[in-house]
Amino acid sequence: MNELNTVSTNSSDSTKNGGTSNSPDDMDSAAAASHAIKKRTKASRACDQCRKKKIKCDYKDEKGVCSNCQRNGDRCSFDRVPLKRGPSKGYTRSTSHPRTNEIQDHNNSRSYNTFDNSNNTLNNNTGNSGDNGINSNTVPSTPSRSNSVLLPPLTQYIPQVGGIPPSFQNPAIQSTMPAGNIGQQQFWKVPYHEFQHQRKGSIDSLQSDISVRTLNPNEQLSYNTVQQSPITNKHTNDSGNANGSVTGSGSASGSGGYWSFIRTSGLLAPTDDHNGEQTRRSSSIPSLLRNTSNSLLLGGQPQLPPPQQQSQPQAHQQKLQQGQNPYSYSQFSQQQPYNPSISSFGQFAANGFHSRQGSVASEAMSPSAPAMFTSTSTNPVNVAQQTQRPQGQQVPQFSSELDGNKRRQSAPVSVTLSTDRLNGNENNNGEINNNNGSNNSGSSKDTSQHSQESVTTPAALEASSPGSTPQRSTKKRRKSYVSKKTKPKRDSSISITSKDSAHPMTTSSTIAYGQISDVDLIDTYYEFIHVGFPIIPLNKTTLTSDLLLVNTQPISNIHEVNSYVILWFRNSLELLVRVALKQKPGGKFFDNIVGVALSPSNDNNKAGFTTATARDDAEKTRRDSHNEVQDTLEVQSVFIAALNECFQKIVDIHPKFRENNDQISPKIKVIYLSTFILLNYILAFVGYDNSFVLGMSVTIFNEFKLYKLLLFPEPDVNDVKAPVDEEANTGNGNTKTSEFEIGSESAGHMNPSNSPNSMDENISHYSVLFKRLYVLLSVFDSLQSCAFGGPKLLNISIQGSTERFFSNDLGSKWCLEQSQLRLKSVLQSLKLGELMSELTRNRISMNGNRKPGFDITNSSSLLSEYVETQPLSVAQLFCKLLIGKHNFINCLLSLYDSEAGVYSDLTLDLSSKIADSLCSLISIILQVLTLILRLNPTNSIDFNYRPPNPPANNPTVQEGPSAMGSSPVAGNLNAAPPSEGNPDFYKKLLGLKQDTGTILSDLCRGIISPFAIAILHEVYNITELVKQMPTSLISIMMTATTTQNTQDTKKSQDLVMKLSNSMNEVVQITSVLTMIKPFKIFEHELNKPIMSLTGGLSSTTRNDVMWPKSGQGLRESSVMKTLLDERRTSGTQPTTAPVAAEESRLENVALENFVSIGWKLLDDSELGWY
């Protein structure tokens, strides 16, 4: 045995030295003890990163890093303990425990107690009993072989003594269990004991089956897996202090009041080897949401706090809970006052799945999927409070099933990023590890460190990244494919976002959702996102009190679908919020994704951000370093992977929708379709071109036949204006919307909190939401068509849809926004989308019979009412800009007669017309930019720059918007340019002048918009094309004044003064453009190499340049001009007009330049803004 210890010691030493050992004594010793550990030479020892990716490692001592780690900015580490070799043929279980427990682990300088001393440990109530209980456990777990079906945990089938229901406990608590209970038999020969009065479920569904839990309906909101129920907590001292210490520190899921579906393995990620084994393993019974759909929804967020008296009897506990909602959902307004972060999303899955048979298979929900909702923060105060829990707690009788649960733990996540970038403060990490080693508390330390404390306030999200500094442990899991020789520490389930956690220094880790509480997600959405563009076309009250209250109890056949849809809707919303969160100086996209607190103070000390030299100024040098390029590419890949995952998961459930179309509630359908709107919003928000997401979204919407609701709206034309008290009286519209009807036995009908007929109301009311969703998707289709120049996929006209479907009565339950002023801002964004839809539907390139100078006066009339009566907003001004641009195009193209081939005479009246259109266009551009700069120049969510609360609805406020239209402020803002010697311009820019227009426009302060990047691109394109026109027109005016009379001369001087002001505005526009940075993830280059078309008045200095984004380089003519010329010449015979046109061209160079600008502006509208 001394020889065995010597071999183990040498192996540990060689591991610490990178696996290098040339000692003959070591080789002889390994040969003599081949049954224990075989020495590995340096040639077969790869660093942890290369081993994880299974690539060749060329590590050398003189270099200190392999080529792979050097390329990825990582460091080579050899922290992983090699796996033990398999036992010899004569291996028996009776001899395995003493031999195994005597092998010393030199990584943590601890020794494992032998199996013979485990009984003495049970009676020892010292502080170190927790570790002894962990290491003395001899219950073997199910071996994980490839393509094997895991048996369910044994403890689920062993009858409970005294009728005590089984509870899901920490594996560390198994030390108190008598060794002769279940450890004496081989696991495959243990007799099967079925629960009494319960059906037999499938193998893969037992751990998430509600029949296994045997929960009282009144306990469904407060039952805790690790925090024992009152009936089991009263016997803690009877079994020893070890388990009291374990549960006291919140080892499994944190005993701070987590719900029953927050399992230990749900909050923690498996280790390197364990996760790899799970990846290789597949289940024979597919499942939509394997293990627990409920454990996926909250992801370690703190929920209901533990009862105040945990030692009270169960009967008394049930009396306290009789007043609670017996269902697994509750309204936001019904939450307990001391628990503001209770999740309305996670409540939908509080009861688990009834069965897995016949469900849809999902790879992300398979047992091989890593945990998604991870723990990233630890509150030392809470840990201390948890450690001081009352002693009246019972050590659970059986707890070995958690090891089996951990093997089948499911949580969907597959977004990778560099773990080096997830590392926190290394100095603090060392202290944490030292404390862990001294406490030697095994399972009780790591989960309490890694159990997530949800960020319950948006201010906390801004103060530090979502989640505090994570912690790690250096102990890695060692397991054998044959048997468990030693009970591994719970460090094997370290959080996937912790420092150097279960994936040590590898290049892949997982994005953790669930770091923002669900209440904060909803509040953040309605505060910062909804006013800019309504992704969820419903007010907050109805959403939280009706739409999200979906029953997921097993009485429904489609509860899996409900939980699955709500889960990925929540994940998509959190992805948007994290992308939109304002980054702190020195921060990165990883801050908002994984919640690692990065700051300039410790940014220079983390590996992965520098390779050779430390940066003195991280904020400045990062932009010029090569690491910045790598960081940008990595951030983009992480974002794309996260977006694609959310999109793929929500698409995978569509076949299930078609199978259960009549049973699925319209609530779930609204949430499901809103998820597609949400994903398209994210694409538009970051300015990323992904036509596949939009195309599949259109396909899904067409599968639901939503277009029929817009094409044939006559049966339910009065749905929009229907108030709440008339819901029961509207009985029409069923024939046209049969696609969205729900069965009479659907779970969606269960809602005792509302009126009896609240869920049985006519489906026509939900059809209003479906119409809105279709209009929103058409808006994103139009936006992508305008931005990237692609064809529009939805050709149904949405003209007038804003008034018909969105501007409904505020008293209606289905209203879009309850605040009148905020509703007007929302409608302006929708009107912008409506205008873009009409512009894309009437493109010249898509309509061969149209002439180049088409009239859009009808589109202008659409916005006449809103332009005059609404508070100033970016969407409203951009609508004016698009209309002014098309009017300006018509004005410029009318200077050339394409039929006769001659230019018009440049008279004073024509020059005045061109100058007025040009000055108006430039003035609107400046107003757009200054308003963006004042409201939200970075288009980010900043909790320190919140939107103001709108005043209460009263007659004074109702008259506010109307009064603004006739106020001199609005008139001055539209008519008088800010540069006309107006000193109030800079006050308005800085928000110092609090007049009516400023106050009303401040309602959009801090609001994010999906149009921000597209608006900036279009503004820049127009500015680059027209910025030289004022100079050219002034030259023409000055030349023409010599031949004009006195009256014309005065008019020319006024035009020159007006054009001079426009030149000053162009300078301001150029300056403001550099101050607006709405870009996220992807960098957009605004200063494209576009040369001015009016560089001079001679044909030799003029440059006709096409956008380089066409991919064909520079050309001398406009794309649209060439296209229309070909159409015209193909339909008519060639004439001799080009000769006359040539003469006219030589005489009217300025006119030709203006016409060329008109063609280029038309190219911009037809080919895309980006």
Swiss-Prot record:
Subcellular location field: Nucleus; Cytoplasm
Region feature Disordered, mapped onto this chain: 1-46, 77-148, 217-254, 269-288, 293-343, 384-506, 725-757, 946-974
Keywords linked to the UniProt accession: Activator, Cytoplasm, DNA-binding, Metal-binding, Nucleus, Phosphoprotein, Repressor, Transcription, Transcription regulation, Zinc
Record field: compositional bias (Basic residues): 473-488
Basic and acidic residues bias locations: 99-108, 271-280
Main location per the UniProt record: nucleus
UniProt DNA-binding region: 47-76
Domain of life: Eukaryota
GO cellular component: cytoplasm; nucleus
Similarity field: Belongs to the EDS1/RGT1 family.
Protein name as catalogued: Glucose transport transcription regulator RGT1
Source species of the chain: Saccharomyces cerevisiae (strain YJM789) (Baker's yeast)
Gene that encodes the chain: RGT1
